[in-house]
Amino acid sequence: MPSVKGTVPLGYWQFTVHLDNLFEEYVGQTWYNALSAKHEWISGKDFPYLVRKDGGDLQHAIRPDHIFRHVGGDSLIIVDAKYTAEIGKPDEIYQMLAYLNYQHSDKNPGQQLRGFLVYPGQELAFYPVTGFQHKLLCVTMPIPYSPTTPGLLEIVDTLTKESWEYQAIC
């Protein structure tokens, strides 16, 4: 039955899709599919810290989107998804540096830390962020992602094993 404004309620419904959350899940699942043979996936884990204050400490936590711990224990990969067109904004770099500098209780001595800020893009491409102690890269990843040669696993393996002075990949 047709609706007439003001006399009959309009028959419709709506829903909201949080594309940033959807992209975060997509990135996690895609990286897990590529890395699962050699890495354990940790997602949604809080890492607590304290702000020491007279009269009582303030408890807070940081939560990286995704962590991939190498089965052999020699690397820890932190992946944070950013659903935005502008890559490498200062607040995103600060956030990743907090994740990389956190004193992870399960971190082994000598374990290499790598940070990947992942953005939607037209092609799989890696852009190094220089000037910091830890290896940090901005990554653009197409939606949908289809494995290419070299694939995501091979590229991440290469980046986690080589020195920071590497040639651009992709």
Go through each PLM region and give its residues.
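Catalytic core segments in nucleotide and nucleic-acid processing enzymes
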Residues: T7-C170
